[in-house]
Each structure stands twice: as structure tokens, then as C-alpha cells.
């Protein structure tokens, strides 16, 4: 059974739209306040090494990454290609922030969602909803993610947090 389409009457977004939405989501997260202990536009939270300015420098450095990930996903890029794009984006983020990790998790997870969104646009010609994104992520890069997760979690035995968990949600 195919997941339901979201807003089927709307014009389809482009990979650029997906990338801009990801960047805007990070800005919206920064703008959300109050967030005890976390950086906002008006507060450093519990961080003495980062503030809204470092987050904005990071966002500026990452703004071209998310559309690239969506484009790569739309072209069926392999996991190593996505990983390379992510590592390059992480390096730009760290250079822009003086080595401060403001968005490493977003580079990885939001980047993969952008790639999945690009894949759905290319394959289904629809606005991707959560179920479509999950299915594309599992189908295209699930095995590579599972192997990466197994390698990363082997010392602490989190093997239950792998592909079966992602794909069964």
C-alpha cells in the first residue's frame, strides 16, 4: 500500500525548495524560544562556546548543502556520495564557526531527509510525506545505514537501533 499524498493539487517542489525548507527549519529551530539550556536568537543557553551568531554563520555555510543532497537523492546517488557531501558540509560548518559543532546532527539526519525527498520527487512525482521519505530512505540507503550503525554501535551493542527500527516506524 502506497502512502497518501500530501497536497496533491499543489505544484511539485524542486530539490532547491527541499534544500531551502531544510535551511529554514534550522533557522526556525534557532528562533524558537524559550529553550532552556539551548541556543536561541536571544540566549546562549548553557553554551559558552556558541551563540546565535555562530548558528547563523553555520546556516550560511550549510545553505548550499541541503539542495545538493536533495539533488543527489533525485539522481539515485550512493551512500558514499551522500557521505562525502555530508563530510564536506561539516567541514564548511566547522570552518565558518571556528571549529564549533552547531549542526553536525542536522548535517547527517536532515541531509539524509533531503536526499530521500529528492528521491521521492524523482520517482513518485509527489510532495513527499513522512511515509514516502521513510520508504525512500530505507530502499536507497537502508543497508548502508544499517552497516554504518552496526560498526558505530558494536562497542556498546545498540544493534537494535538499525534498519529494522527505522523502516518499521
Report residues per predicted region.
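Gly/Ser-rich oxyanion-binding loop with an adjacent helix/lid
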Residues: 81-145
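Single conserved hydrophobic/aromatic residue that forms the stacking wall/gate
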Residues: 160-169
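Generic N-terminal targeting/processing segments that precede catalytic cores or assembly contacts
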Residues: 2-96
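Generic hydrophobic, helix-prone segments enriched in Leu/Val/Ile
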Residues: 19-24, 137, 155-158
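A structural-propensity feature for long, helix-poor, extended segments
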Residues: 142-158
Amino acid at each position: 500500500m502506497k502512502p497518501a499524498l500530501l497536497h496533491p493539487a499543489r505544484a511539485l517542489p524542486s530539490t532547491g525548495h527541499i534544500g531551502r525548507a531544510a535551511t529554514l527549519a534550522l533557522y526556525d529551530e534557532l528562533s524558537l524560544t524559550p529553550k532552556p539550556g539551548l541556543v536561541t536568537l536571544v540566549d546562549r543557553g548553557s553554551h559558552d562556546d556558541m551563540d546565535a551568531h555562530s548558528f547563523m554563520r553555520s546556516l550560511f555555510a550549510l545553505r548550499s548543502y541541503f539542495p545538493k543532497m536533495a539533488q543527489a537523492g533525485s539522481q539515485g546517488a550512493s551512500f558514499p556520495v551522500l557521505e562525502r557531501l555530508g563530510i564536506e558540509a561539516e567541514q564548511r560548518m566547522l570552518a565558518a564557526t571556528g571549529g564549533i559543532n552547531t549542526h553536525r546532527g542536522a548535517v547527517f539526519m536532515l541531509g539524509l531527509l533531503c536526499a530521500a525527498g529528492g528521491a521521492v520527487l524523482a520517482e513518485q512525482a509527489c510532495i513527499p510525506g513522512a511515509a514516502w521519505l521513510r520508504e525512500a530512505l530505507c530502499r536507497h540507503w537502508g543497508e548502508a545505514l544499517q552497516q554504518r550503525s552496526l560498526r558505530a554501535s558494536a562497542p556498546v551493542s545498540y544493534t537494535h537501533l538499525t534498519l529494522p527500527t527505522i523502516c518499521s516506524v
